[in-house]
Every structure is written in structure tokens, then in C-alpha cells.
Amino acid sequence: SSLKIKDCEIDVGELAVKCPFFDEIKNDSPNLSDFINEELISVINKDSDRPKNPSHIVLYGFGRIGRLVARMMTQSTGPGNYFRLKGIVIRKASDDDIYKRASLLTRDSVHGTFDGTVRVDEENSTLVINGNPVKMIYASSPADVDYSDYGILDPIVIDNTGVWREEKDLSAHIKSGASKVILTAPAKGDIKNIVYGINDQILNENDQIISAASCTTNAIVPVLKSINDEYSIKGGHIETVHSYTNDQNLIDNFHKGDRRGRGAPLNMVITTTGAVKAVAKALPELEGKLTGNAIRVPT
């Protein structure tokens, strides 16, 4: 059967299970054609829902979060009709920087080997990830970049450095050509901290800079909202058990923090967390009702 269908995903296995005469059909069976036409009526002879031009995405930073987002965007790349990773902005650490970045993307101690191909095009300062050319842009700050120089048009910039958290600083991405900025850390000031499924309804098309909050905030806010909606929270304490981070020492040594000098792989380290403030931004009704701290643990 030859059908004109729009871009979509079709589960052939599900169709086979639903077909009441699957074991008896032959190729080009009229009954089969009728069955398929009936099941796929919503996508036959319809225009595609996909936009004509994909939104360009730029990762500003290529640490843990940046590399995992790059994996997610390119591992099952498809035609890239909605979003397309076009650039990664980092500070150059060495002459062979691009090869080391490629290695870190390919191999991850927690998430394993990248399910795809990563090729270095050193001459063009490009990583070709699953066939997607991604420009490696070396810059010290957002002000040093003009995305149009690289053929990147009105990109959505995902700032995963955590260095800039205020609107006046993150606005530098807009001046560099970004259409929107998503911060992967709790924001300061009036920037909206969004926990998807909880308060994303406050977003509007005019928002240029938003925060996706933090891992802790995304983990605890849905639970707190459920409890507060059902029973009403009068007060509480957030104790987050967190993987140790790059800010800690591998072995006991001096650290500006009170406890972070202890060897990370061998100790549970109590420290502060910004999750309480971030929770209050997502759930304003809990402001002033919570305290919190974090325990960095070996993982």
C-alpha cells in the first residue's frame, strides 16, 4: 500500500497486534489496505506539523549538563525539524582542546559510551555528532561571540555554566544574537524559575530569559506541591543527598569551604544548598516555610 502521510512515528508492532487478521494477510491485500487506511486516517494526506525551519540551539558551556544535553539532542537525531544543535561555546584550554572535548562526549563514567559517532573536523573547528556538524566556538564571555558569523540564526542559548545568573549578565547572550536564553541553574532576581509541569503555565512568548531551576529543585518541587495541595505545609526542611561535584577535593586538602576539603570519594560532606530559594520561586506559597542543606556523597 502506498500512502501519503505526514511526518510522524508509526508503531508497526502495535498495528500488527491490532490487526485482527494479521496471520492470514497477503501482500497488497485489500483488507490490509482498508485496515491501514482506517488506523492512519489522522496522518494520511495531511500537512506536516513540523515547522519549516528548525530552531538553532547553542550550548554555552560543555560540562556535565552541556555534554548530556548534546547527547540527548543528537543521539536520536532524526531530521532535526524542531531543534538543531548548531554550536557549543567554551574557553579553549589547550591546543588539542577539541579532541579532548570529543573524548569527554564519547565516554562518560556514569552514563557510558555515547550511542553514536563523534568525528573531529579540526580544520573547521567542528564536531560532527551523528552526522550533525556542530561548531566549536571559543570565547571568554558571551560578549565575545556573534552567532551570525557562524551561520547560527536567532539561536536558543542554553547557558549551562552557572557563572551568570542575573538578567543583566545573561542579557549579553541576547546582544550576541540569541533569541532566547535558558539557564540550567537557579536564577537570581526576577527571572522565572520554571519546573516543567508545575509552573510552566506562567511562561509567555515574550519571555527571553528563563531558568530551568536546579536538579534538586526539579526533584523536590513536585513532591512539595502534592503535599501542600492536599494537606498544606506549615514548615519543613529539605535534606538533599547529592553526588559529589568538581568543586570538592579528591583527597583531604585545604578548601575555602568548611567541609569540602575532605576527600570527596570517602566522605559525606554537609554543605549549603540554594534549593530553598529556588523552591520558593516555583512555589511562592512556600516562601519562608522551608530550610535546607545538602549532603555531598560518594557515587
Spans of model-derived segments:
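C-terminal substrate-binding/catalytic lobe of Rossmann-fold NAD(P)-dependent dehydrogenases
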Residues: E230-G235, E239-S243, D247-T299
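N-terminal Rossmann-like NAD(P) cofactor-binding subdomain of oxidoreductases
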Residues: S1-N249
